[in-house]
UniProtKB/Swiss-Prot annotation:
Organism: Mycosarcoma maydis
Biased composition (Basic and acidic residues): 384-393, 691-703, 853-866, 874-896, 904-1023
Gene behind this protein: NST1
Location in the cell: Cytoplasm
Listed Acidic residues bias regions: 657-690, 771-802
Protein name: Stress response protein NST1
GO cellular component: cytoplasm
Function: May act as a negative regulator of salt tolerance.
Amino acid sequence: MAKSKLPRSTPAARAAAVPPPRLAAAAQQQHHQQQPPSTPPAPVPPTKPSVAGASTPPRSASPVSNHDTDSVALSSAKKKKKKSKSKAKDADFIDDQEYELQQAAALAQRPRSPASLAARAQAQAQLLAAASELYRRIEGDAQGIPDDDAYWTSLPAHLRTFIRNALPLGQFPPAAQAALNENANDPANRHASTQAMIAVAQQLAQAAHASQRHIQQYPPGTHPYPPLPFDASIFADLALHPDQPLPLHPHPNTANNAHPTNVNGAYGQYSSSPNPPPTQPPVEPLPPPVVLYDNFDDEIDRFDDDGVDDAHYYDDAELDEDDEVLEADAGLLRARNRVWMQEGANHALRPNGLATHPDGMRSASKNKKKKKKKKGGAGAAAGHGDDEAHEIELEVPPPKPVPNHPPPSTNVSSVARNSNPPPPSSRAAGKQPMTFNSTGKTPARPANGLPPSSNSGKRSVSSSTHGHPPAANASANNAKIWSTSSAEERERIKEFWLGLSMKDRQKLVQVEKETVLRKMKEQQKFLCSCAVCGRKRSAIEEELEVLYDAYYDELEEYANHQQRWVSSGGTIPPPPGPGPFPGSVALDASGAVIGGDPLSRTRAAHAGRDTRHTHTHTHAHTHTHTHTHTHTHTHAHQHPHPHPHGRKASLHPESSDGYDDDELDDDAEYDDDDDDADYDDEDEDDDVELEKERAREDYDKRNPVPSARRRGTNDSNDLFGLGSSLTVKGGILTVADDMLKNDGRKFLEMMEQLAERRMHREELTNAELAASDDEDDVDGPDDVDDEDLDEEDEDEEDEILTEEQRMEEGRKMFQIFAARMFEQRVLAAYRERVAQERQLQLLRELEEEDDNEKAREARRMKESQKKKDKKKAQREAKEAERLKKDQERAAAEAEVRAQQQAQRDAELKKQEEIRLKKEAERKAREDEKAKKDEERRRRQAEERERQLEVERKRREKEEKIRLERELQEKAKRDREEAQRKAKEEQQRVQRAKELKAKEEQERKAEAAQKEKEARAQAQREAKQAAAAASRGASAAQGVPSSPSTGPKAGSNKAANASTPGTPARGGKNGSVTGPPTVGLGQDQVQPRGVHSQRSAASSKHAPGTGGPNAAGGLAAAVAASSVAPAGSSSNAVGSTLPAPPQGLPPRPSTAVLTPAGSSSQTSSVSVAANAGLPRPPTNLAGGGSSSAVPPSLGFGSIALNAQSNVPMPSAKTPGSSISPKPAQSFVQPQEKQPSPPGFGAAQSPMGAVYGQHAGLDSLRSPTLSNGLQNSGMFGSNGSMSSSLQSPSLGAPGMGGMTNSLASLNLNAAPLSSPALNVGNPLISSKTPGLGMESSTPTGHNLGHMHSPTQTPFSPMSGSGSVDPMRSRTASFADSDPMSFAGIRPGSSLSQRVPTYRSGAPTPIGPIGRPKAMDAIQQHMHDEHTGAIGNGRSSSTTSGSGATSPRLPEGILGSSALGGDDDIIDPKPRRVSHTIPIGGGATGSSMGSAGSFFGGGMGGGSAVGGGFGVGSSSPWSSFSGNNPTAPGPLSPAFNGGGAAPGSIGSGLATGNFGLNQNASTPGAGSSGSGMAGGAASDPWARMSTNSWDRARFAFEQPGGNGVGAGSNGGTPSGLGGIGGSHHAHAPGSHMGHLHHQLGLSAGPGNGNGSGSGGMLGSFALGAPGSGTRNLFGAPGSNALHPGAIGSALSPTLPGARHVSGSHE
């Protein structure tokens, strides 16, 4: 195998050539030796000298070089050393080359003359103009010239000849093949054989048209810069850095030229970043300097990548070849897409073909195929670390565009920029045959080139393969990708090539060869390492060397031919082919090889056959290698082999071109190999990133794609277009393009096939020789064998001929490949030289500008200095003149100043004298003034002392006077206090006597009557109680019960005269028409109609006729809850009291007096043995009104069970709303609330309840005489309007109650009598008052509070609903109210009162005893004549006059009311604003504060007050709302219920006894009651809410008032009405005091649930009721221990306290 004929340089030699100084010197020397003519003709290639002169200086000479060319050259030398197999003469050649390079460097350092620069620039401009024109013509038809023949004829003769000679012949039809064999060199035959190849080249060239167009837009010759000395390193560097844009023009992919399809980023670095388009001098750093380097493999890869980038192709094939060769050299930096990169860097090209250059100067977009190839290239490049050392960043400014020359490169670049992925990169494009249009200029494309076509890159190969594109866009784009189509460009490149010296050419070829070889080796390193493959690699390398050596010879011969042709002026035929190198192919505008279509059509069938043959061979070969190679390798071989075989078959016919068969074969093989290597290298770059196996697989995958892209070409299986497939996708141009794209797989396959063919041919030769020997030895053993042998020989000869033809074709293919690669390299070198020239020119211009600027600056400085000096002189002259003037002026001024100074001195002297004189005077004045001030201060001090003394004396005097006055006042107060006490004591004694006398008289008078009435009433009440119990439900509904009539006492009539007798609380419940009554029980609220009905009913009943008690009547309920049937008056039996006088309920058998006149109802409750204790009304007002219980205030029998159905006399004084009515539903029928006689339960009327609480049956206080006058606490005026009717009291009325306090029957005035209407409109307005029936149902129906006032004082039937107020017990007399208080029947107050009073904070006068009350009234307002002691004052009811039994000494409270004349003088009690019981009943509203019931109904002494309604009663410490005046009888806890003194919170609003704390008017609501704010009775010791004291029974103790309401709610009415009121009335004060009366059986919050009025019946507070009853017995939590029930009456067992009523 022939070895490389090119000398190889040793590393040392190469290193010696590297240093920039030597390179520059060599370039300079070369420049001098080869001066170009001043104006070479543009169309005609310049003469060799001019071309030589045009050689570019070494890039290293550029001052912009960024790389050390020494190191680069050194590394390149190392690479060469590794790869080279050169002989010793190579070193000599390199030495010579180095010498030339040194000369060039020296020349480069020398400045060029302007003339030479201008000539060079003009020549270049002409060259570029021609190229541009050609490209425009080519680009005129985007689809390419339809008629290839026309295009072919348009080519210059020398190009056609070159194409004919250079292009290998493919497989032809038998006739054509025979003709070809006969005359292989015949131009026509060659033309016919190469048409397919040309078509392939044209189509591949289309891929570079875009780039070329761009290049033409910035043609290298358009700049005025002088050429630089030639340096082969330029080409090496360009080849190594194909991806770096040539400084000649902006790369299509640059950002500046944002060509849509610009996938080539190589130029991007140049144009976008460091270097502007070549048409403009770069204003930014230029591309890195180019380093010549023999290893072009990498650069080839880069150029291949550029080809992949489509847009990077530069029209000149030289540049592509150089780039491809450079890329083939592993040691060099890759110039993918003109991006100069270090070999070691990752050179994987981006989709735009940019390698990942460290600088990052790469386009962002690439075709997918490029990406793959770039990846492979990157991997391959990574292996070329040495390339980094070889990179010389020569940033040559792009030449300014020559105005004369249009930018033809625009067309070229646009063609080159075809974005089809497969399209060759700029280098690949350069390697593709230059398209040539000699005719017609097509309009230049814009600089950006083609519109973007993402698919164009992929289709470029196929389109380039065809004269017609597989897709219109693809062909158009392909046409635009190639920028070397300009014939002028080719001419200029040719001139440049011819201008090079032989050594330069050799060096370029050597660099190209080494680059390709390196790339091939890199590609092979991924292949199998078996021995077979190793031998194949060796064969390939040898084949490559041989091919390149042969190609160099061809180059020389071709160059010589060209030179001769040029020198001859066309007398001799031009060299074959378009040039400038053997094998160059011209492409039409569509990228198809000029004239390729006819040939391709004629050869299509032959190609198909050859392809099939090839495949057969390929498969055989593939199988052979399959065992040793990876599958990828197998595929790679499989596809490549067909084409190489085809090529070899066609190459051998070409062997007659003056090349040995071997040489041709090698050349073709190498051409194939080289082409394949180029392609392989490109693919290899992709494969580097892919796996080694994928390298082949990718190639296999790409093969079909290119075949698809190259539709219309020969069978896609024919990889390289060898033989019959010149036009297929795998054509040699494609191989070159791939190689330029750093994809050397195809090239490697081609070379492998070539090598295999050569080996096969040698084997055949050896076999033939051996066979001939064998035949000689074994000749003729058998004729048949001889015949067979002959046939075999013939076949072998045919095969040999075919093989020779293929070898010849392979040689031609390699020529095309090498031409493509070399064109690219030379083009790169040429452009680099131009760039360097431009750069140097720019630098020179810059230096000139700097020098000029410096000169101008110097001139400016000089002029400025002169001006400054002049100005300075002027300033100095002026300054001197000024100084002179200043001196003169200063002298004059000095003289003047001297004179002035003298004058000033004299003046100062004068002034000083004057000042001294004035100072002396001033001092004298100051001394005098100081003396005066001192005197004045002294006088002032003395004056102050005098004043202080006077003041002290005055204060002493005043103090003395004050003390004396105080002593006098104290003495006076003492005297007055003593007198007052004495008077009070006297008055008290007198009152006590009077009361006692009166009580005795009344009792005596009433005793018989009451006794009689009591019995009758007891019977009636028993009956009524039974009826009420049965009708409890109906009573709750307000259904009136049949009233029980009772005897009417004349006294009651009399009382009624003043105040209409309390309407009898017959079984019929007086329904209060006011707001629904709040029943203590379930039926707390009743429509007013009910109350009004009750009141009406009660009014209808004649006095003494008990209204029918509703089953729900409070008294009935109480009685029921007491468990004592209403008829159980047996307990009442035993009362020794005389029959009550008329007007009072008849006494029960226990001598409870029944007021005959006031109420006809008879107390069915017989006073128990304990009747001596005053009992709170058993009828609880507050729950549902119990009509069954006519409220009868009176201390009837306490038996709770006994319902005192004492019909109250319905006689009412006008305006008395209180008429005896059945208790309202205010008290729930007992059926609903059986156990507690709460409001919810039917209860006996208050009075009844008072006497009828369970367990209290036996507890009966002796009835008090009802002789109390009707002055009643409410006054006889109807202020209470008989709101309080205590049927038991002669005239059931608060007045009666209060007045009868002495007897505690409080019958003085029936509640219905006007006495109760203490002017309290509330009562008259049906405000139920406890125990009062007011025609006006109050919000609190006192009726519900059945006899809350049914304290013994009077039945408290509220208006309407007040019926309950009317104690169903016999009137107070019946129920013997005082018996509740512990008063014995005979005594005005039972002796038990003291027991009660034992717990009272202050002594209480005996209730009902006139004298005691007198004493009490001493503290009461005098106007309250209705005080308990003064019961007679206004009470019109006649009392029985029976005196109460003896009053044990020390006994206070109700027991003090006993008949004993001896009056226990109570200790001074707190002055209460409330009137005494019964006193001042007529006060404001019920008699403000003074009524027995405490703060009257209206104001202070309302019934509620004294009666507990207002809490003004003695027992309510907090009368009404006035907590400050606790009555002595009631510990000071007014549950905070009604206003003091109001019966509830005024009997006015609430019925009597309803002290409603809540807003609910009625007893218990303060203010709402009759008199909300009456001052508390002196006796009122407990809060009104708490009728905890026994007196509560009397006064219906009323903190809560009669219905001392719950604290929060209205205090329950009298006797628990309040408590239960709490339910209907403002929540009963249950929480605090049980509803005092305990009548509040209704659920009151006071007692717990309301039933517990303090006094269940009088809040008897049976145990279990959370409250203590009025008597303090447990059962009412609020009951104060001193309650009557607890202490007052020893006979009253606490158990008897109505606990049931307290819920």
